């Protein structure tokens, strides 16, 4: 229990520092971009809430079944959790492409074209990659439940390094487009070790 708590605390710390590095880069782009990004992030956090809920559920589910030696049930549970979160992702992609300006206005109360345009751009681009963070949440928590506290932290370390590089490299070259692409790039890199480790354990 202590190891699991320590591992989760380490993951959250790495995620926080990675997000902070991106925010520092965003703050250099001016007020309209800051407002747009803040609004888009709030909407994204709402869109991704089921991923977190499913992740917590899978940590408990996998822990119980690993203790009982029922790996077949873990495989089935992970598969079903991925399907459910991917179905949700499809819905959020559809919502991003049909209602982004309205959602952004709802959050900001702003009709500034630059705010609406950049925030919509963010949502439409990042939502196409929601399958990756859905898998990250499910697999990372499943591995925690199965007793692997190293791989999830390693995955979070990739997030930290990736966001720092994107903040100081992509953002300088591509401006806000670099920020928009930062998370999809990092998500794909993060999910790779989680998939490999899960397949090895099961």
Regions found by a protein language model. Give the residues of each.
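Small-residue-rich hydrophobic transmembrane alpha-helices
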Residues: 37-100, 133-155
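Short runs within selected transmembrane alpha-helices of multi-pass transporters and secretion channels
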Residues: 51-55, 126-145, 151-163, 179-195
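General structural feature for long, well-ordered alpha-helical segments within catalytic domains
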Residues: 2-9, 13, 17-22, 33-35, ...
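Helix-terminus/linker motif at the lipid-water interface of multi-pass membrane proteins
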Residues: 13-42, 46, 64-65, 102-112, ...
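Hydrophobic faces of transmembrane alpha-helices in multi-pass small-molecule transporters and flippases
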Residues: 1-21, 26, 46-50, 54, ...
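Structural signal for membrane-spanning alpha-helices in multi-pass inner-membrane proteins
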Residues: 23, 49-52, 96, 141, ...
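Short alpha-helical transmembrane segments in multi-pass integral membrane proteins
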Residues: 1-6, 62-129, 170-202
């Amino acid at each position: 229990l202590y190891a699991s708590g320590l591992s989760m605390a380490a993951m959250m710390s790495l995620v926080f520092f990675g997000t902070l590095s991106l925010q520092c880069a965003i703050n250099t782009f001016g007020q309209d971009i800051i407002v747009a990004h803040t609004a888009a992030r709030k909407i994204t956090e709402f869109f991704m809430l089921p991923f977190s809920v499913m992740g917590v559920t899978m940590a408990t589910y996998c822990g119980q079944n690993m203790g009982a030696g029922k790996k077949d049930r873990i495989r089935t549970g992970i598969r079903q959790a991925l399907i459910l979160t991917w179905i949700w992702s499809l819905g959020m992609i559809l919502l991003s492409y049909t209602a982004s300006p309205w959602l952004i206005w709802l959050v900001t109360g702003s009709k500034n074209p630059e705010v609406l345009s950049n925030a919509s751009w963010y949502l439409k681009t990042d939502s196409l990659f929601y399958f990756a963070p859905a898998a990250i949440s499910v697999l990372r928590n499943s591995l925690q439940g199965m007793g692997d506290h190293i791989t999830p932290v390693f995955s979070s370390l990739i997030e930290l390094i990736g966001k720092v590089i994107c903040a100081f490299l992509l953002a300088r070259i591509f401006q806000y487009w670099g920020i928009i692409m930062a998370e999809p790039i990092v998500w794909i890199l993060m999910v790779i070790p989680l998939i490999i480790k899960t397949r090895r354990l099961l």
